[in-house]
């Protein structure tokens, strides 16, 4: 049968209020902070902080990661890297200065040869060119410029 009063109400008038005579509800009965995470607080640590204890794997200190990082772009996507205005201007004056497309600024390193280029010269700057990409750019009167 449920009780009508809460425990705190029942303990009114009792000096120690259920906390004993000696310690008087003081100090740190379970240890301070994260003490006992492997022992008496084990359940809490396993449930809410899995993987808190222990080591995993080995550390390779002077490892050079991903040296083969080389994002690529194909010729058919090359004109999408420049603004619409540049495309319109290049189409209008065929004899003027060729537009420069810097693929490195757009986050690519290598130009690959898939697709066709429109018949207007263009200067492409990149770190690497595939053989077929270089042939196609030069066939429309463009130039391939290697950048560091």
UniProtKB/Swiss-Prot annotation:
Residues 1-38 are annotated as: Disordered. It holds the Pfam family Ribosomal_L27A. One of its GO terms (cellular component) is cytosolic large ribosomal subunit. Coiled coil: none annotated. Hydroxylated on His-39 by MINA. One of its GO terms (biological process) is cytoplasmic translation. The modification (3S)-3-hydroxyhistidine is found at residue 39. The modification Phosphoserine is found at residue 68. Keywords: Acetylation, Cytoplasm, Hydroxylation, Phosphoprotein, Ribonucleoprotein, Ribosomal protein. Component of the large ribosomal subunit. Component of the large ribosomal subunit. The ribosome is a large ribonucleoprotein complex responsible for the synthesis of proteins in the cell. This is Large ribosomal subunit protein uL15. The gene is RPL27A.
């Amino acid at each position: 049968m449920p009780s009508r009063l809460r425990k705190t109400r029942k303990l009114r008038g009792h000096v120690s209020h259920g906390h004993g005579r000696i310690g008087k509800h003081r100090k740190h009965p379970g240890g301070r902070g994260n003490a006992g995470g492997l022992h008496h607080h084990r359940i809490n640590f396993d449930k809410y902080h899995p993987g808190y204890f222990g080591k995993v794997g080995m550390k390779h200190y002077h490892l050079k990661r991903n040296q083969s990082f080389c994002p690529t772009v194909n010729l058919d996507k090359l004109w999408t890297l420049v603004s619409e205005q540049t495309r319109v201007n290049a189409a209008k004056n065929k004899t003027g200065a060729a537009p420069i497309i810097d693929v490195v600024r757009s986050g690519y390193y290598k130009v690959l040869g898939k697709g066709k280029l429109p018949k207007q010269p263009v200067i492409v700057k990149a770190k690497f060119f595939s053989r077929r990409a270089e042939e196609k750019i030069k066939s429309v009167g463009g130039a391939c410029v290697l950048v560091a």
